[in-house]
Amino acid sequence: MIGVTVTVKLQNKLAKDSIIMSLKNVSQYLFTEERGLLLRCFTNVSDTQVDMFHLWKDKSYQLQTRKEFSTKFWKDIIEMGGVVSLIEGKCEVEMSSFINSSLVKI
């Protein structure tokens, strides 16, 4: 699995909320067997900053989405004055015993 954390700092709360809404609008498309996104978390750090964590089934799914969507999306945010930073790497997952792991396909 591959974990990707994206930090986005924007000019105002409206811009941040708009980015989050745009990403949520493509969630159902990415949360499929063919697209490989397993989990996405939004952490509202402040009115103008959001950190997002994405968990991908493997690197090939993440690269496919980056090629088709993400690179242009983040470039557009930067051109509008936002600051985007990204870190990624192999990811090891632990789950709480409160989660029924038999329902989770990883």
Please tell me what each predicted stretch does.
Residues 1-50, 55-71, 78-106:
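Short S/T/G/P-rich N-terminal loop/turn motif that feeds into the first structured element of a domain
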